[in-house]
């Protein structure tokens, strides 16, 4: 016979588990899961399982803020459980929890911000391909792979990276 999934799980107190087990590119699923478990009266604690090298700054910030808010406003304990890797944004998310659990071998920390892009201008020139850029501002084509970076662009990007790093 087939037993519906909900009927197969005994009633009573439960622990909600939010899994973040890949590079962090979006906060949507984790925040939805956190909200769901926070609303459910039969969920008595929330575990955020982290197995991630980190990822996007904005997505990591959004998850961290939700974890921290639940920690500060809910009676439910929220526990960060680190797997083999919980680095950068994963570490940041864990900081919002009431408790952080890690194994001695967990690779964690590594707070930093990186930006890179290829510069293919010479290759394009060798192929005989020409390109034109029309822009509305001096930095609008910053980061274009078709040209070398200028001193002004490097300073702009370094400031951006430093600002994002300081938000950690």
Predicted regions and their residues:
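Small-residue-centered hinge/linker elements
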Residues: 1-77, 85-168
């Amino acid at each position: 016979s087939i037993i519906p999934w909900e009927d197969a799980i005994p009633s009573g107190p439960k622990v909600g588990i939010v899994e973040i087990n890949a590079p962090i590119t979006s906060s949507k699923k984790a925040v939805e899961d956190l909200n769901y478990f926070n609303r459910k009266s039969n969920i008595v604690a929330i575990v955020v399982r982290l197995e991630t090298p980190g990822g996007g700054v904005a997505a990591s910030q959004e998850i961290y803020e939700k974890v921290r808010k639940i920690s500060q406003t809910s009676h439910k304990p929220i526990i960060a459980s680190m797997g083999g890797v919980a680095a950068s944004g994963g570490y940041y998310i864990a900081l919002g929890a009431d408790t952080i659990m890690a194994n001695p071998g967990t690779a964690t920390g590594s707070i930093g911000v990186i930006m890179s892009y290829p510069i293919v201008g010479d290759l394009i020139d060798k192929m005989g391909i020409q390109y034109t850029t029309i822009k509305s501002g001096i930095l609008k084509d910053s980061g274009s792979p078709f040209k070398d970076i200028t001193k002004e662009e490097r300073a702009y990007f370094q400031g951006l990276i430093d600002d994002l790093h300081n938000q950690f």
